[in-house]
Each structure stands twice: as structure tokens, then as C-alpha cells.
Amino acid sequence: MMVTVVSNYCQLSQKQLSQTFAEKFTVTEELLQSLKKTALSGDEESIELLHNIALGYDKFGKEAEDILYHIVRNPTNETLSIIRLIKNACLKLYNLAHTATNFPLKPTGPDNSDVLLFKKLFSPSKLMTIIGDEIPLISEKQSLSKVLLNDENNELSDGTNFWDKNRQLTTDEIDCYLQKIAANAKNTEVNYPTGLYVPYSTRTHLEDALNENIKSDPSWPKAVQLFPINTGGHWILVSLQKIVNEKNNTQQIKCVIFNSLRALGHDKENSLKRVINSFNSEFMGEMSNNNIKVHLTEPEIIFLHADLQQYLSQSCGAFVCMAAQEVIEQRESNSDSAPYTLLKNYADRFKKYSAEEQYEIDFQHRLVNRNCYLDKYGDARINASYTQLEIKHSQPKNRASGKRVS
């Protein structure tokens, strides 16, 4: 990869930046590691050079971006001043990018690469996650959040943004976290989070999922099934377990609905009751294979209204993740553990914490959840974005000058 260098770009205008592309050198793995070492020692030019390389779309651009991101994400007493330099550099680049966007210059090269100079700053990227922490304007944070989270369903439409410390988790964030902790689980399975109702219908996503699973596998469910469900601005966790009674040769589905509030509402409760009961009264009666009937006779439904959000009004999604993790981990230790018992014990234990302790538990979970999203789900989205840029623009060059412009 050939790259030209800009240093002290906080003092460059966008026009100067476009007109001073002279000195170039080859980026290598050895160079990146050397720059990382000198950047960690506080060398500002190394930090700025890493940012220039990070603007690229090839593997070195990604590696440089990772170096900066992981320094910021894992602060120590020794790196606090370094992190401030990195954040300042990111914000300066972002401000230059806005200048270029608002007052675009005529491209200077046939590959249109000047226009692409700051493309990564407006695409899903780890640079974007660093920038968002530093941007003071809420509206700009929200715009970046839409890109970073691919928020097509406007889950952040209440004025919150990705960097808010007290906001609801999105569908993708919850799914990413739960899939990670359930990846090697043998006794519990996690299903993709959904809304309660199918749009423009009284039918629920849960009944669709249950119907599809039973049709494809009459012995389903073999493991405990967890369904994160958004009832409309609020997340709950539905647990389904098949109980076998060998004495009378019957099988039963037990359903536990974990709700971190003190109530769910009669309409929503009735909808969920109808979903479970309909397997016996409606769906199973229409199945030609009568052997399936015994799987769902006399279902039992328990609503566990845990009332955990006295101090954490926007943490229903976090509670779904933490409660699901409790079930998954405990059932790996003891597969006979009943979901209701595990969820009840979790809720009772959490209530014993002081308000300060609850805040800290919630805060630490959100950090882990965010990092999980960025490392897994976010990386996939970022890599897809890079791939599209590479295909469309055929390896655009990093543009910058080796001269310090004052």
C-alpha cells in the first residue's frame, strides 16, 4: 500500500490537504507495529500517521484503525493522555471531512480519490465510534448512530444515540450478545429478537416461530428456548421448556415470561396466553400427525414481573440479556435447572443490591454489550462496507502530505 503523509492536519484547510500530495511511502506490517509503539509513547506525529493509514480501505487501513480503536477502548493510567491525542485527531479529521462535504473541491485525480479521502468517516467504522464520543452536537451523534447501527427501524428515534449511557439496547445489540454467550450452550437455545405483533396483524411473531419449529421438527423443543420480544418500547424474555411426565406418558410445554417491570398490561398478557394455548386448541387440532399433540397439552404459563427498573428506566434490554445469561450459564452447570427458578433467583438477587451497585452492574453490562456488538456484529457490517468501497472505488489512495503546514 502506498500512502502519502499529512501531519498536524488540524492546521490544514481541505484545499491545502488536497493540493499537497507529494511524498509517498510503502506501508508494511513492520511499519504499523513501529508506529503503534511510538504512538503509545506519546508521539503525536505517529498518532496522526496512523489516522492517515486508517483512512484506507485495505487490510493496512483496517489494522491501523484497530490499533487506534483498541488503545481507546482499553484505557490505563499510562494511556489516558495518548487517548486524548487520538480522540482529538479523530475529531479534527471529522471536522475536515465536514468542510470537504459542505464545500467539495473538484477532484484532482482520475480515480476521484480526493472525494473518497474521508469516506470511512461517513461509513460504519471504528473511527466513527471514536468520533461519536467527542462530537458535542446531539443531532450529529444521532446521524452517526443511524449509520453505525444500521437503524432502519428507528429504534433510536426517541432522541438517544449509540453513545448514550442510558438508552434501550437495539435488536441487533441484544441478538449479538445473546448469540455470543449461547454459542457453545448445549441445554439452551436463543432465538432472534422480534417484536410482539406481526405488522398490520393481530398475529404474533412468537406463534409464527413456534408453528414453524413444530412443523419442521415434531420433537421440538429439545432444549430450553429463549425468545427476546419487544412488546412496544419494552423488552421481555420468553422461556419455553418441554417437560416429560413418564408416569402418565405425557409431555407439556411450560412457559415463563420474564418482565423487568412490575406489570405488562392485560392485552399483551392475553396475547401471549393465546399464543401458547392455541397450540392445543387450534394449531394441534389441525395437524394430521396426532402424535404431536402430546407435546403441547395443558401448557403452563407463568408471568414473572420482576420489578427491577426502579433506578434503571431504560434497561429492559440489558435485563433481558443478563437474565438470559443467567439461564444459559446455570443450565450448563445443571441441565435440570428450571428457568423459572433461575429467573426468580436472579431477580431476587439483583433487588438486594443498592442503587449505586445496580447502576454499576448496568453500566458494566452495557460496556460489555457494546464491545461485543462492535467486535462481532459491527465488524461484519464494517467489513461489508469496506468490501463495497473496495469494489466501487478500486483501492483509493490515502492522500496526505509529508510537509507540516502551519
From Swiss-Prot:
It comes from the Bacteria. The lineage of its organism: Bacteria, Pseudomonadati, Pseudomonadota, Gammaproteobacteria, Enterobacterales. Keywords: Hydrolase, Protease, Thiol protease. Protease that can act as an efficient and specific deubiquitinating enzyme in vitro. Does not possess desumoylating and deneddylating activities. The physiological substrate is unknown. It is an enzyme of class 3 (hydrolase). The active site is at H234, C316. Its EC number is 3.4.22.-. GO terms for biological process: proteolysis. InterPro entries: ElaD/SseL-like_N, Papain-like_cys_pep_sf, Peptidase_C48_C. The keyword Transmembrane does not apply. Belongs to the peptidase C79 family. GO terms for molecular function: cysteine-type peptidase activity. Gene3D superfamilies: Adenoviral Proteinase, Chain A (3.40.395.10). This is Protease ElaD.
